Amino acid sequence: MCAEIDERVNAFLARPIEGAWPYLWIDATYLKSRQAGRIVSVAVIIAVGVNIDGRREVLGVATGASEAEPFWTAFLRSLADRGLRGVKLVIADDHKGLRAAATKVFHASHQRCRVHWMRNALARVQPKQRPAVVALLKTIFAQDTAEAAHAQWRQVADTLRDRFPKLAELMDASREDVLVYMAFPRALGPDRLDEPARAAQPRDQAPRRRGGHLPE
């Protein structure tokens, strides 16, 4: 049974990728794996693409000991070798290695995942104050143009600065990374931008390294 499952999974992960996939979402979680008699932490990466028709599909999965640039580069090149092309925007958490690999392999821009960013932002706010802060942050993503979104971001950061200095500091440092998508076609709206990440982590909670075990 296990051999049959392995064969089907390997065939799925090695299948050719056809057509253009402009948007590529990448998410990572951590699991414990038994290797050579020891329990070690490994990164499990999943890549979800969206094609020009708006169809979503899991394009690849990989595991690795770290999330350094060589790992990301090897993973993205494996997708390219299977035929992945036309990638314009890679959406993921704030991984410097992934940012460099996306540029190297696909010449694509990197969009910081808004779901992860929002959780990081709210971790700097007391729970009872979060609804008001969320309402302010949402006004940024409701803007119709990149210029308006950047202006609203700065205004919201200044509004929050006195009460939430750590949140304002995060906003100052991450504005360009979170608003990259505003330079792309409006069809990639905020709701669609967040769909794969919400599906992967549906609960409204602070980010954490999820536990579990992979077989040896």
What is the meaning of each model-derived region?
Residues 33-34, 99-100, 179-180, 200:
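Short helix/loop capping segments that flank catalytic or ligand/cofactor-binding pockets
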Residues 2-91, 96, 104-108:
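RNase H-like nuclease fold core
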Residues 23, 41, 69-73, 92-99, ...:
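Amphipathic alpha-helical transducer elements in NTP-driven molecular machines
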Residues 142-216:
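Acidic/histidine-rich catalytic cores and adjacent linkers
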